[in-house]
Amino acid sequence: MLERTLRVLEYNKVKEQLLEHTASSLGRDKVKHLVPSTDFEEIVEMQDTTDEAAKVIRLKGSAPLGGITDIRSNVKRAKIGSMLSPNELLDIANTMYGSRNMKRFIEDMVDNGVELPILETHVAQIVSLYDLEKKITNCIGDGGEVVDSASDKLRGIRTQIRTAESRIREKLENMTRSSNAQKMLSDSIVTIRNERYVIPVKQEYRGVYGGIVHDQSASGQTLFIEPQVIVELNNALQEARVKEKQEIERILLMLTEEVAVEADIVLSNVEVVANLDFIFAKAFYAKRIKATKPIVNNERYMDLRQARHPLIDPEVIVPNNIMLGKDFTTIVITGPNTGGKTVTLKTVGICVLMAQSGLHIPVMDESEICVFKNIFADIGDEQSIEQSLSTFSSHMVNIVDILEKADFESLVLFDELGAGTDPQEGAALAISILDEVCNRGARVVATTHYPELKAYGYNREQVINASVEFDVNTLSPTYKLLIGVPGRSNAFEISKRLGLSDRVIDQARNHISTDTNKIENMIAKLEESQKNAERDWNEAEALRKQSEKLHRELQRQIIEFNEERDERLLKAQKEGEEKVEAAKKEAEGIIQELRQLRKAQLANVKDHELIEAKSRLEGAAPELVKKQKVNVKNTSPKQQLRAGDEVKVLTFGQKGQLLEKVSDTEWSVQIGILKMKVKESNMEYINTPKQTEKKAVATVKGRDYHVSLELDLRGERFENAMARVEKYLDDAQLASYPRVSIIHGKGTGALRQGVQDYLKKHRGVKTFRYGDMGEGGLGVTVVELK
């Protein structure tokens, strides 16, 4: 991209505003080196990245980029063995914390369902160096001082220093408080000179205290003397301070070496947070100028909706719709000077430069922009004093350069094309130049005040006229771009408003050809039609926005309704589960009582005790279960139930054996030690046991109950497996098994953990352990039952 183009389109001013939104010198460095890209894929990714950061700002308001500094030179010095200062190490720790904090911030948003695929990829590159970070902050305080707790040795040395200082001060203060000292001292204070404690002694008493003179006052009347009695103490203090300095240097070298070990990771993290600072600066700038993400296409057309110049106050500037590249490839904006034509030209150019830099642009949603390999701009009066070139010559030098380089991947912007010379020749040159650039396939926006170019827009298929609206009532431009309508001078209307007589104006009209008058009238009608069409469009757009608002409100209400419904269902489900859980606990207690009855002696179990236990067990079923319909899967006409068949009683989820049919719809069923009547509709056929030698059986089933000593869960889904474990343990308890095995396999460990978590809470489990070598090892859990 030509440097001149960036300058005349004020690209650097946009960068200056962008700099204000960076959080660190790292981000500022990225902004300073920012230039527009010409790679389509890169531009799309940059726009998507800025959009993700803008989403974060919309949801969170900001991003935690504080505390990050440019530590790259410090880290490189650490790599070559230089000792870093406490503040330099603290900057490294703070930057490590900042990068770790930013990583956690983005990952938390992603975990909460916010889609940030690009930013997630960025923070995934950040490697946490928490241990090194804590080592530094444990050794260095917020003020940059090495703290006592940095090492036991340093703590001991500083204790010695404080003790020595206390003893010295105590001796000196005793000396200054004595009655004789008042006349010998200039002041009753203890001070420090050359890092040694001294007292201010009058010149004539210098020999009283002995010791060492370290300094004197400006008048020479006071000497700062270290009395002989504290010389040894001061010497000991100095020795301790030397040891302190050596220990601090050792600690700093140790920390520096640890930074050097992790230098590559630290530098990599710094590069990531520098990019994040840069990305979020673009997002904050987009918020500031009310910019949006454009749709980037590679089909060489743009559709800027309600485009604004980013450097002009959005409350002041008039937004415009600018289309180029589909129905026409060249826009010629005609009309008088000071009408806003140049602002429109610059708006097109700066929006393209910003979009190709990954910046959002000040337009409405759904605006589109294409990628140009080159952008050429001939804007403004840039006379070359050194080359003694006129305005026309200066422009022509630029135009010659443009004509040499422009092609079908170029955007060309001409301001006042052909100006600065004879109007007739200038208009002819402008037409030829436009033809040349258009024939090369470039996209062109040109401004001119030559009326000859109005006809140009009608005579060329890919060219369209445009103008900036002028309000004759206020005698000022409205800055509204009218595409398809050439500009008018409005000289007669302006003159009339300013008081020129109708007679003079009518005479002036007579000097203009009939064709010219017709053209002016036609243009006036076009302007009126354009205004009406735009008014209709604005009304339609307002209705569309209102419809979208209503649609969003309806969606919100639907979401709230669904959330409330789900919340109520969840609450009802939770209440149901609580009732079922309470029923299970009660049933377990009853089963335990029945087991105790059986252990007593089968002959001692009275009928009324069984009837009472049966009633209590049935009463333990929660209302939700009692009321729900039972889905019978097995009682098809082909399967006739017979005495001895094994069935599942659906109400209790327990296996039982049919004893005898007591009515057309009921059977007497043996469930563990209970015998009860159950309707066929409440049974599920399991199988018919093989005929074995019949034994005399009491009304209680013994250890020939059909429950396996092990439960194999391999291949089961987690939820199904947990349901089977629950049922199996109940069956095993009814069968009075002291020990059972649950085979869950090794796998990922999820099923094993789930089984053991359940066993911890089961009231019927005494203990459990992993299987021994011969029992299946970690793939099996052996359960001891109560």
From Swiss-Prot:
Q: What is its EC number?
A: 3.1.-.-, 3.6.4.-
**Sequence positions that bind ATP:** 335-342
InterPro entries, sorted: DNA_mismatch_repair_MutS_C, DNA_mismatch_repair_MutS_core, DNA_mismatch_repair_MutS_sf, MSSS, MutS, MutS2, P-loop_NTPase, Smr_dom
Q: What class of enzyme is it?
A: hydrolase
Keywords from UniProt, A to Z, are: ATP-binding, DNA-binding, Endonuclease, Hydrolase, Nuclease, Nucleotide-binding, RNA-binding, rRNA-binding
What biological processes does GO assign it? mismatch repair; negative regulation of DNA recombination; rescue of stalled ribosome
Cited Gene3D superfamilies: 1.10.1420.10, 3.30.1370.110, P-loop containing nucleotide triphosphate hydrolases (3.40.50.300)
Q: Show the PROSITE patterns listed in the entry.
A: DNA_MISMATCH_REPAIR_2 (PS00486), SMR (PS50828)
What GO terms are given for molecular function? ATP binding; ATP hydrolysis activity; ATP-dependent DNA damage sensor activity; endonuclease activity; mismatched DNA binding; ribosomal large subunit binding; rRNA binding
Where do the Smr domain residues begin and end?
711-786
Q: Could you tell me which Pfam families the record lists for this protein?
A: MSSS, MutS_V, Smr
The free-text function statement in the UniProt record for this protein reads:
Endonuclease that is involved in the suppression of homologous recombination and thus may have a key role in the control of bacterial genetic diversity.
Give the family, as the similarity comment puts it. Answer: Belongs to the DNA mismatch repair MutS family. MutS2 subfamily.
Q: How does it assemble?
A: Homodimer. Binds to stalled ribosomes, contacting rRNA.
Q: What is this protein called?
A: Endonuclease MutS2
Q: Which organism is it from?
A: Bacillus cereus (strain AH820)
Q: What are the top taxonomic ranks of the organism? A: Bacteria, Bacillati, Bacillota, Bacilli, Bacillales
